[in-house]
Amino acid sequence: MMEILRGSPALSAFRINKLLARFQAARLPVHNIYAEYVHFADLNAPLNDDEHAQLERLLKYGPALASHAPQGKLLLVTPRLGTISPWSSKATDIAHNCGLQQVNRLERGVAYYIEAGTLTNEQWQQVTAELHDRMMETVFFALDDAEQLFAHHQPTPVTSVDLLGQGRQALIDANLRLGLALAEDEIDYLQDAFTKLGRNPNDIELYMFAQANSEHCRHKIFNADWIIDGEQQPKSLFKMIKNTFETTPDHVLSAYKDNAAVMEGSEVGRYFADHETGRYDFHQEPAHILMKVETHNHPTAISPWPGAATGSGGEIRDEGATGRGAKPKAGLVGFSVSNLRIPGFEQPWEEDFGKPERIVTALDIMTEGPLGGAAFNNEFGRPALNGYFRTYEEKVNSHNGEELRGYHKPIMLAGGIGNIRADHVQKGEINVGAKLVVLGGPAMNIGLGGGAASSMASGQSDADLDFASVQRDNPEMERRCQEVIDRCWQLGDANPILFIHDVGAGGLSNAMPELVSDGGRGGKFELRDILSDEPGMSPLEIWCNESQERYVLAVAADQLPLFDELCKRERAPYAVIGEATEELHLSLHDRHFDNQPIDLPLDVLLGKTPKMTRDVQTLKAKGDALVREGITIADAVKRVLHLPTVAEKTFLVTIGDRSVTGMVARDQMVGPWQVPVANCAVTTASLDSYYGEAMAIGERAPVALLDFAASARLAVGEALTNIAATQIGDIKRIKLSANWMAAAGHPGEDAGLYEAVKAVGEELCPALGLTIPVGKDSMSMKTRWQEGNEEREMTSPLSLVISAFARLEDVRHTITPQLSTEDNALLLIDLGKGNNALGATALAQVYRQLGDKPADVRDVAQLKGFYDAIQALVAQRKLLAYHDRSDGGLLVTLAEMAFAGHCGIDADIATLGDDRLAALFNEELGAVIQVRAADREAVESVLAQHGLADCVHYVGQAVSGDRFVITANGQTVFSESRTTLRVWWAETTWQMQRLRDNPECADQEHQAKSNDADPGLNVKLSFDINEDVAAPYIATGARPKVAVLREQGVNSHVEMAAAFHRAGFDAIDVHMSDLLAGRTGLEDFHALVACGGFSYGDVLGAGEGWAKSILFNDRVRDEFATFFHRPQTLALGVCNGCQMMSNLRELIPGSELWPRFVRNTSDRFEARFSLVEVTQSPSLLLQGMVGSQMPIAVSHGEGRVEVRDAAHLAALESKGLVALRYVDNFGKVTETYPANPNGSPNGITAVTTESGRVTIMMPHPERVFRTVSNSWHPENWGEDGPWMRIFRNARKQLG
């Protein structure tokens, strides 16, 4: 039976206005829209009155329900039939944890009520299309129709393909029908294999073969034999990549054989809780570094949010499934798309060349895709710290003559670093009889055929197959699984995981055979033991679907009880679906039909399938010389600063949490004005050291339209110049990931790919001492469609994205682009040696040209000398600022440095040649360094010692003020206000934010950038930052116990525990499941802290599901009430913990006036480094800090204070319960965005109780308790940042 319950309004006023504006633009007479959530409860038994009231209360969240009955025609948008939304999974979990076992499943839709004039059927279809995503949603016209969401179908049996009866044609038909993308020789191989077995193949076996042997999974092109221009080549592409490891194996612990590569890290204190006692402590051991970079291009083209989200999720799983289990740590993300053509902001170089109906626009990708990637990282609890964004789409004269080149099939890059224990780097042995386990969520009928689909050019496969290959994301589930993996590796020698892989392309059909095969075993499986939420799925659908957030593991049979205990505590679902066998055979039994859908020798599936041979021809690009006519420097500057590749990326940065873990030492945002120009990302190796890791990206894809090899060399060079200004040491410490994207089969591209791989793998990297131990390829970067009567193709340039990773000696010595105005000199290190080539530059692109000669690595020895020289200068502390030269050239390098320093530039380019345009806009490798004027001679001497004397040019100095002036020989070449340039540079991000977020907030942020008087972030402290008020109490040896409380989805507990630990507490890991099961109580604790994250993925209001699981369980409710009423206890709630505790007002004395915390005014997750002031309040945690003004990490989507009315707000303030407020950089309390990131009235962001014993706050002091983890800080701070005082105050209060 189904019950329907109304919910809160689903759209804010500005979202409704945007919809109405879109309808008006489409000339649809829609006058008004109202939208509200509707909840559907599938019940297995009727609810009594109390249970019904409880369900209603559970589903009451968000803004208040409209009092009036909605008017207009109903359009009900629900998740696509046959799928279960992430919201449903998490909301159902909450209902069960609150004792509502009669609820089979909760689901949610949006009811749109449309008031309109007379609309034709076609116009209604337009309205419907505007209100839903056909890839993920279904539209109904009556609420009762939602009953179809819960329809259950009978299981369907396996289907046989009549090969023996119909011969080869049966396989050809199945290939088309199932979208298998099998090549002719693979069809021959299968015909031969099954004829020898003497039976017909089942559809599931063919599907499994296609996924396991797709280009996506098998990398056939990279393993192929090559004939180029009739000449047999000596090596495959992969062998040339492996050559880098053979030449420089130094510091690499694992390459090419696992889900990620591993290199040596540093010995540090890894901080985690003991399995038996729950007590957190440091464990001194090597924290080796793992690295991985994936792409998820095809799904992102079809449905950008889930495509990018599952791209990040899959890469995170790769990291976690490395060795015998590892810890993902920090991420990077990248996008290459065609031109944005922002409505009303189209740029002169953007022409509309059309696109296929079935893929979305570049603008859609960049509106939704980054949000999906960021949302997954945010909810999982991994900071996203680095990235790139390129737009390219043009008709150019390239290798194959004049043709369309661009990224209709986008690049969506997802990568990152993690850490792994030394004894877990290598996978274990799988014993015969070992249990084969699926860890994670249930099978669902989604994401079918992703491996094969992403191996085809967009436009080749059937639209329905594209539809089937879209996936859905549930990062909170992945977090639960990762917590289990963490508990396992933390056990050291007792780790129950023998072998682990993630489930990705091809689902279990790919993952399980890979698991057993890699472990040297076969496997026997039972299909019906696989967790499934859809009983009507066929064997093929159960075995081959790509439901996300799953891992496959081998666990020794005697370790299963321990593994079971860990999973239950973390509420991570798992199923034992088989066991390892001696015989290298794969059998899958179906208990329901008592048959064998799979019965194959492993070598048929993974054996010697036909090897590919690529017989290709070389084509050389001629290019046309750049036409300079009509190009002025002033116009070029304005155009280039508006090119999205160059322009400000704030809209891509502030949506992503950049402080979670408390180990982020360098994010994208630089300096007091928080400008996104960092060269690289940096994390500390632990919470107790200054060792660390760095990541940087290099890519220069448009250059490949002129010179394949140069483009590849530049990608490596740019990654190196980006990562150089950190303290790494020997260049051999740097390891690279290479992600290759190409349109295989397109004339000239295959030979070009070979040329590019050879340039990097055989020549440049070995010469530099660089290794590429990991990478990925995507070989179908072409889109085909019909535009009117014309067949069109959009082919991407050959694109190599290099991600560089390194172990750091000291993260504090990372140099940023932020300029200082002390007596200084700016030096350009020009590795282009005066070539100043303009081919395939940003300048060429904004004038719709390609040019002829591009930049290149001109001298490998000088590139190596450059790196070594910068390392020497970093070690000698001679650099004030550093920024590499890249897209946009020297002009952009200097401008970005000036933006970061909020200063002027007085530049002189006289020594850079007579061609001023080329001097300013060439994109040859190099960097600008700022040094003290007094150090200039010593610095030039170091550069000369490294062979760079002829590359160094004095190009002026940074000066106070707002003028950005470039001269040569006393003549002004360019002069403009730095503020004007800053505003131009910001206009793309402003327009994207206006489209995507609340336009009023976007306007306020853009307006703030034009204020030259803005003093930037600043600090005023009312206390001595170096005083340790807890020291006398720590000296007694007593360590009070603090319960570090977490719920499923919480992700900030480790850094919180570390902050309390440093202040003299014993921090104890307490999961809500411990309290609900009675394993742990609160009676032994002196303090309690509820941590940040996404409990239950925030589905029933941020923190509300967590609170209700306490309020609706009598014993646990009493436990919390008793704790809060006990004298001499302290409690802190941060972010999600703040939201949760604000919903426990009925249990917390003196909290009656506390507000609720609701959706930010921007309608967006906000990650900012915000200025707050400590106000006079009873808060015991903030004692002695009143009047202080200091920045703090902010990361939330629902942090806006909501009060009932003005009287409620006045009472809250008059009682003095407000503890922190947002202030602007002038020190004034503010409601203006982004200084106030959520729009809270009067800047309120923390409140306390009347006794001061319980304080809740939205910002994160635990993430910035160490100075090194602050995005910016005054230079005179020591180890501890000012927010450490909160935790020491807590220790002091407890005596």
UniProtKB/Swiss-Prot annotation:
Residues binding Mg(2+) are: 718, 722, 884
Q: Which Pfam families match?
A: AIRS_C, FGAR-AT_linker, FGAR-AT_N, FGAR-AT_PurM_N-like, GATase_5
Q: Which UniProt keywords apply?
A: ATP-binding, Cytoplasm, Glutamine amidotransferase, Ligase, Magnesium, Metal-binding, Nucleotide-binding, Purine biosynthesis
According to its UniProt record, this protein's enzyme class is: ligase
Instruction: State the superkingdom.
Output: Bacteria
Q: Where is it mostly found?
A: cytoplasm
Name of the protein: Phosphoribosylformylglycinamidine synthase
